[in-house]
């Protein structure tokens, strides 16, 4: 993880030394330093743990983790990045947001089996965004590691807030190009719980990576409908996921399967782990 942390710092423009200890899936420790190049060629390192060089408003956004908002790289200077890439049991305030939406009445998945994940991500405008997901605890560390790597490489993700912001409406979330994970729902047209119901599936940049099904008569179904132009995967466009894509490689490396590889239909946004 240290190599990823260094890359993150290069991406944000400041130095950061990170050491991790495997305490639990939610516990990590870190040390932050700022490096100054001196005129004699040597380097001077100083702790910046208490340094707060940017406007107070953004630090409040970061402290309260106001997902969906953007911050400057200066806001992260001296900030413990472990707090920006982490998973934890679902806080009460988050669980309240989920009630009657992604966590519906009759949900058979226990709160204790789920985790709230915080990550940073870049959008296509070069802005740092605060992201959030709810997932199954078995993939929480995978997601933290994947999104650390994607952030370090400045991989663009337009939006990442809980699907509850869209009333747990999958179509509305996809149309907003919102990356999401847990949502207790059934596979369309069935009474079979989707892998999203268990928090073991994630939809990444879904508007640009739609669900596509071609019938025997040649008729093509695309979801969401507003993503028709992105159903042709021979074209190049932003946020596109294919086998050369960094996100594809990172998810596959950790044992996830990709919906874009399915035979009867393709769900290009979709990664899941059994």
Regions found by a protein language model. Name each.
Residues 20-42:
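Long, intrinsically disordered low-complexity tandem-repeat segments
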Residues 40-122:
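N-terminal module-boundary/linker segments of secreted carbohydrate-active enzymes
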Residues 15-17:
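Boundary at the C-terminal end of the N-terminal hydrophobic targeting segment
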Residues 50-65, 186-193, 198-274:
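Catalytic cores and adjacent binding grooves of peptidoglycan-active enzymes
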Residues 3-12:
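Bacterial N-terminal signal peptides
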Residues 109-174:
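Active-site acidic/histidine clusters and adjacent loop/turn architecture
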Residues 156-200, 206-211:
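Active-site-adjacent loop/helix surface patches within enzyme catalytic domains
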């Amino acid at each position: 993880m240290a190599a990823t942390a260094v890359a993150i710092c290069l991406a944000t423009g400041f130095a950061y030394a990170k050491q991790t200890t495997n305490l639990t899936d939610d516990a990590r420790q870190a040390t932050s330093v700022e490096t100054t190049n001196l005129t004699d060629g040597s380097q001077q390192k100083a702790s910046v743990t208490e340094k707060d060089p940017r406007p107070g408003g953004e630090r409040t956004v970061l402290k309260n983790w106001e997902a969906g908002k953007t911050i400057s790289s200066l806001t992260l200077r001296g900030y413990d990045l472990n707090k920006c890439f982490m998973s934890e049991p679902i806080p009460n305030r988050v669980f309240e947001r989920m009630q009657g939406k992604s966590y519906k009445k009759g949900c058979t998945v226990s709160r204790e089996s789920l985790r709230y994940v915080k990550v940073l991500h870049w959008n296509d405008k070069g802005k740092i965004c605060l992201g959030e997901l709810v997932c199954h605890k078995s993939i929480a560390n995978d997601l933290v590691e994947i999104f650390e790597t994607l952030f370090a490489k400045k991989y663009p993700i337009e939006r990442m807030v809980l699907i509850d912001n869209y009333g747990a409406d999958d179509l509305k979330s996809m149309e907003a190009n919102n990356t999401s994970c847990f949502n207790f729902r059934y596979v369309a047209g069935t009474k079979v719980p989707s892998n999203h119901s268990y928090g073991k599936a994630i939809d990444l940049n879904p508007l640009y990576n739609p669900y596509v099904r071609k019938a025997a008569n040649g008729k093509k179904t695309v979801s969401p409908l507003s993503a028709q132009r992105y159903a042709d995967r021979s074209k190049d466009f932003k946020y596109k996921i294919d086998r050369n894509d960094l996100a594809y490689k990172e998810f596959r490396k950790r044992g996830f399967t990709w919906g874009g590889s399915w035979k009867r239909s393709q769900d290009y946004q979709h990664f899941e782990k059994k």
